[in-house]
Curated annotation (Swiss-Prot):
One of its GO terms (biological process) is translation. Residues 34-58 are annotated as: Disordered. Part of the 30S ribosomal subunit. Involved in the binding of tRNA to the ribosomes. GO terms for molecular function: structural constituent of ribosome; tRNA binding. It comes from the Archaea. Belongs to the universal ribosomal protein uS10 family. GO terms for cellular component: cytosolic small ribosomal subunit. It comes from Halobacterium salinarum (strain ATCC 700922 / JCM 11081 / NRC-1). Keywords: Ribonucleoprotein, Ribosomal protein. The keyword Signal does not apply. This is Small ribosomal subunit protein uS10. The keyword Hydrolase does not apply.
Length: 102
């Protein structure tokens, strides 16, 4: 049987956990086997910028940071389960990728 690998990525870990819970509920309702969610390493993007717009004065810096959290879920590729997966309401800041594997 084919497996669907669901990759979730977003900046808010609470949103990711909510979607992971919905995927597990769908798997329980349809009776398919699910493994995960597996938390993947968090990527940290840092951008340093000068506070002074003209370059004069002391060299003071601001550091901006964005953390990208990722989760991985493997689910059996049942037609009903995949149809319900496509209907999940996903927030705009969460990226979902579904890949079918043998």
């Amino acid at each position: 049987m084919q497996q669907a690998r669901v990759r979730l990525a977003g900046v808010d870990p609470d949103d990711l956990d909510n979607i992971c819970g919905e995927v597990q509920e769908i798997a329980d309702k349809t009776g398919v086997k699910v493994s995960g969610p597996v938390p993947l390493p968090t990527k940290t993007l840092e951008v340093p910028s000068r506070k002074s717009p003209d370059g004069e004065g002391t060299a003071t810096w601001e550091h901006w940071e964005m953390r990208v959290h990722k989760r991985l879920i493997d689910i059996d590729a049942d037609e009903r389960a995949l149809r319900q997966l496509m209907r999940i309401q996903v927030p705009n800041d969460v990226n979902i990728e579904i890949v079918l594997e043998d």
